[in-house]
Amino acid sequence: MFFEILLAASIAVVADTYAVYPALVAALGVVRPREWRKDDSHTPQLTLLVSAYNEQDVIEAKLQNCLALDYPRERLQILVASESTDGTNEIVARYAARGIELQAFHVRRGKSATIARVLPDARGDIIVFSDANAMYRWDALR
């Protein structure tokens, strides 16, 4: 008799966890939907730091990707750290009017050293690191 009660209690706990509780939450969501407000007043300042080395083939797509991100422009600093010797710096410089900042270095010291040199200029409360060939979904920063 004890084992039958224990088995029934175990089945009830599992059923509650995987069936009853999710059904109640879904029903509550239908009955009392939450009003969704997009409030950017508490959105932190964010720096998107893109490191680039001879990325002229992909840098323009990366910059377009950065500008298309769903994050308030006044709260987003896009900073490109480049040690490039190809046309990457010239492409990035064309985006200066759109708020993209370029820090170009002529001596190659490697990715870690370049990031370390640029970090003091990052104004964000949060810093997101990215390679030039990594494309983000539009909502990746939220």
What are these regions (language model features)?
Residues 23-33, 55-68:
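Short, well-formed alpha-helical segments that are part of the catalytic scaffolds
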Residues 127:
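Short aromatic/hydrophobic "clamp" motif used to bind/position activated sugar donors
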Residues 1-40:
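N-terminal membrane-anchoring/stem segments of glycan-assembly enzymes
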Residues 76, 99-101:
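Short, conserved active-site loop motifs that form the nucleotide-linked donor/cofactor pocket
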Residues 60, 87-90, 130-142:
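Acidic donor-binding/catalytic loop of UDP-sugar-dependent glycosyltransferases
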